[in-house]
Amino acid sequence: MGFVKVVKNKAYFKRYQVKFRRRREGKTDYYARKRLVIQDKNKYNTPKYRMIVRVTNRDIICQIAYARIEGDMIVCAAYAHELPKYGVKVGLTNYAAAYCTGLLLARRLLNKFGLDKIYEGQVEVTGDEYNVESVDGKPGAFTCYLDAGLARTTTGNKVFGALKGAVDGGLSIPHSTKRFPGYDSESKEFNAEVHRKHIMGQNVADYMRYLMEEDEDAYKKQFSQYIKNNITPDGMEEMYKKAHAAIRDNPVHEKKPKREVKKKRVNSTKMSLAQKKDRVAQKKASFLRAQERAADS
């Protein structure tokens, strides 16, 4: 079919229908959302849970949500800015941090529903494929589906780091190894060791070592926060191991204590009758003095 020019006449504008607001803003992929939200008709009022992952410039947001007519209901949430509490103070938006955030979300959710002792997940990080299966005689594994939003789902994307963390944490999320770092599209093989290196931050550690040898100034500029916190390439794996253990020990969110604000009285107090009379007398006196000066001059 050749090029067809759109004729923007009266009929075009009369029949024109705008897309949804969040589509116009480039925030929601409604094609994907429809498939993630609509539940099987034989499941009636059972919610269809989504694991929402969003990566911003300084944070990674992970949430478990389900859709209602009124809007999405958030069941549980975890953020990368919580990781300093668990010992990860730098690199809060890399692949290793995404894994930690996904793990934190999974452990927090299972703790909330009392399933954390039944579904431990994969404690030893191997980077290999792992799937959670329901235990007989116990409540079934918590199942949800990955919602990557408008992120480009290429191999090695940080969204899949959060997914792997959640699966290792004990959530049942349908997935394959094709989008994890270490998968070779040509040979169709998955190298779990490469994936484990990314989870443990060894790709960052290797780059740190490279810059230390090649360009000292670039290293100091790029990894200034690592230097400030005394984090070396050799100690990075241990840092993430401790963080994973700390997350499993206590995934519960701690609310910030409310700041007590001292209220300042802004409205002025009313003047008494005597004060009002005194002010009138002062104004009269100043007016008369000004009149006398004007007469003398």
Swiss-Prot record:
Listed Pfam families: Ribosomal_L18_c, Ribosomal_L5e
Single GO biological process annotation from the record: translation
Biased composition (Basic residues): 255-267
GO molecular function: 5S rRNA binding; structural constituent of ribosome
Keywords, in A-Z order: Cytoplasm, Nucleus, Ribonucleoprotein, Ribosomal protein, RNA-binding, rRNA-binding
GO cellular component, as recorded: cytosolic large ribosomal subunit; nucleolus; synapse
Region (Disordered) residue spans: 253-297
Keyword Nucleus: yes
Keyword Amino-acid biosynthesis: no
SUPFAM superfamilies: Translational machinery components
Localisation: Cytoplasm; Nucleus, Nucleolus
Assembly and interaction partners: Component of the large ribosomal subunit (LSU). Part of a LSU subcomplex, the 5S RNP which is composed of the 5S RNA, RPL5 and RPL11.
Role, per record: Component of the ribosome, a large ribonucleoprotein complex responsible for the synthesis of proteins in the cell. The small ribosomal subunit (SSU) binds messenger RNAs (mRNAs) and translates the encoded message by selecting cognate aminoacyl-transfer RNA (tRNA) molecules. The large subunit (LSU) contains the ribosomal catalytic site termed the peptidyl transferase center (PTC), which catalyzes the formation of peptide bonds, thereby polymerizing the amino acids delivered by tRNAs into a polypeptide chain.
Protein family (similarity comment): Belongs to the universal ribosomal protein uL18 family.
Name the UniProt record assigns to this protein: Large ribosomal subunit protein uL18
Organism, as annotated: Gallus gallus (Chicken)
Phylogenetic lineage: Eukaryota, Metazoa, Chordata, Craniata, Vertebrata
